[in-house]
Amino acid sequence: MKYSGRTATAIIEFPADMILLIKRETVPFRGYWALPGGRSERGETVEQTIIREVKEETGLEVEVVRKIGEYHEEGIQDKVEYDYYPACFLVKVIGGEMQKQIGEIQDLKLFSLQNIPENLAFVHNQMIKDYSSSRES
């Protein structure tokens, strides 16, 4: 099976240099930590995608602050081939209540930027590095 297409990923910033990561329940990268996000639906902008995906996965309502970057990620993980073109956005919480999506997410957890887990899915480590660099400039 091959997954491909346009995706959107969110860095949800919290006080004290914390960001929200999800632990994936689905392949590829089952059991890995990841930034919230997912595939765009037909006719949806990447900005609309990230607002929808964050709500589905975390229960939080967000608005886009700015784009962090555009990426390409491809490979094989868990016997699943993937070829994605994600846009990564910084978003801020404007409502909702944090709760994980049953069946898709194993866990939700806040991590400090100095204590990000090593087992990150896709190219999310690079996205977090780019976000950190953009905060310092």
Regions picked out by a protein language model, each given a short descriptive name:
Residues 72-97, 127-131:
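Active-site-adjacent beta-strand/loop module that shapes the phosphate/pyrophosphate-binding cleft
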Residues 13-18, 28-29, 41, 70-74, ...:
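Short, charged/polar surface micro-motifs in flexible loops or helix N-caps
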Residues 90, 99-131:
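NUDIX/MutT-family hydrolases
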Residues 2-4, 32, 79-85, 102-105:
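A generic structural micro-feature
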Residues 60-70:
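A short coil-to-beta-strand element that immediately follows conserved catalytic motifs
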Residues 18-56:
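Conserved Nudix-box catalytic region and its N-terminal flanking loop in Nudix hydrolases
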Residues 1-19, 86, 90:
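Conserved N-terminal beta-strand and adjoining loop/helix that marks the start
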Residues 133-137:
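Acidic/histidine-enriched, glycine/proline-rich intrinsically disordered or flexible terminal extensions
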